[in-house]
Regions:
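Single conserved hydrophobic/aromatic residue that forms the stacking wall/gate
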Residues: 1-7, 11
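Conserved acidic donor-binding segment of nucleotide-sugar-dependent glycosyltransferases
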Residues: 269-282, 289-296
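Nucleotide-activated donor-binding/catalytic signature segment of Leloir-type glycosyltransferases, i.e.
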Residues: 178-225
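Donor nucleotide-sugar binding/catalytic pocket of nucleotide-sugar-dependent glycosyltransferases
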Residues: 80-97, 101-118
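A charged, aromatic-enriched C-terminal amphipathic alpha-helix characteristic of glycosyltransferases
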Residues: 282, 295-329
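Short hydrophobic beta-strand element within catalytic cores of glycosyltransferases
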Residues: 235, 255-258
């Protein structure tokens, strides 16, 4: 037998009390386009359930950002077949109940990232490491900018913001690349490289940005320096359910400003952080100005205390352990 076949047989022979789904894409493949995978997923769930397994699903997304029909169907199956669904906020739970009124649900917050990154980094040391101004008021937007709407929203508001020492730190802003991302399409490849080497430096100087290409990941060793160097963390999504950048910012004692949507808007409002209407530039400017004041008043310390009391790994882990017991005991 092949090694792969032996592994498959070994998995089938095991007994599991709990199977915990995090990302349905991870089960079927992040770019899956095989229609037969849906049948196999349903069969596998039925098989393990027949052997006494119970299923828990943590709802990170309503649907993936780039989902196809097969992945969306996988979401439907896992949502409907799970014995308990864990949500990171009441917003998600209430929305889910409208679709699955008979489902069992629990609310468990996203954990803060204790013991994951270097935490004892001063603002001065972080800015020195990243070669950033010690005097700038730095607003950081983490993560890949997914579309032009997010770019326009952030750049439009930031350019209009009347803050003399402002700097936008956006490591994955621009849709350009120095890599051969377009294969044999010479024109697109040339435009992308020209944007990377010529337009990016020009725009950074013009608009007080420290921004990079959206296909270049931040090294995990560098990530805590970006966080520590910031005054405010900006969540640049227009439509999103959860963001790990919020608990990460809380761990680093930072103020967070984000859209008034999903679990994010709920958490930020409850903790005294500014929220905004993502389609209203004036409202974004108001939120940025409020974030600047809150940073000076110590809201970052309030966020850290809240995170440690309500989102610690220990507390979140205990909540999931209780959820597993609930699933097993029915």
């Amino acid at each position: 037998l092949s090694i792969r076949r032996q592994r498959q047989m070994c998995i089938r022979d095991r007994h599991y009390d709990i199977i915990h789904f995090q990302w349905p894409e991870e089960v079927v493949g992040w770019t899956c386009n095989d229609p037969d995978i849906i049948r196999r997923l349903e069969e596998r769930i039925s098989f393990f359930r027949s052997r006494g397994a119970r299923f828990v699903y943590t709802r990170h997304n309503v649907r993936p950002h780039y989902a196809n029909g097969i992945i969306s169907r996988a979401y439907d199956i896992i949502e409907s077949q799970s014995d308990i669904v864990a949500h990171m906020g009441r917003f998600s739970r209430d929305e889910f109940l409208t679709k699955y009124p008979d489902s069992q649900n629990v609310v468990i917050p996203h954990h803060i990232y204790q013991y994951t990154y270097k935490e004892d980094i001063s603002v001065e040391r972080a800015r020195q490491y990243l070669n950033l101004s010690q005097d700038a008021f730095i607003v950081t937007a983490f993560g890949k900018f997914r579309n032009r709407e997010e770019i326009r929203m952030v750049l439009g508001a930031f350019r209009a913001w009347d803050e003399e020492h402002k700097m936008l730190l956006a490591p994955r802003l621009y849709p350009f690349s120095r890599r051969n991302s377009y294969g044999k399409n010479f024109i697109k490849r040339w435009i992308s490289k020209a944007g990377y080497y010529l337009l990016m430096p020009l725009l950074n100087r013009m608009y007080k940005l420290q921004a990079g290409a959206n296909d270049e990941l931040i090294d995990n060793c560098d990530l805590p320096y970006y966080m520590a160097a910031s005054d405010v963390i900006f969540i640049q999504r227009k439509d999103i359910l959860n963001s790990g950048n919020v608990p990460l910012a809380f761990l680093y004692h930072k103020v967070v400003v984000g859209p008034k949507v999903g679990n994010i808007g709920e958490l930020l409002s409850e903790t005294g952080n500014p929220t905004f209407d993502p389609d209203d530039k004036k409202d974004i400017l108001r939120a940025l100005e409020e974030a600047r004041r809150l940073a000076a008043w110590g809201q970052g310390e309030v966020n850290y205390t809240y995170g440690m009391e309500n989102m610690s790994i220990r507390k979140v882990g205990q909540a999931y352990a209780q959820t597993y017991k609930q699933a097993i005991n029915g």
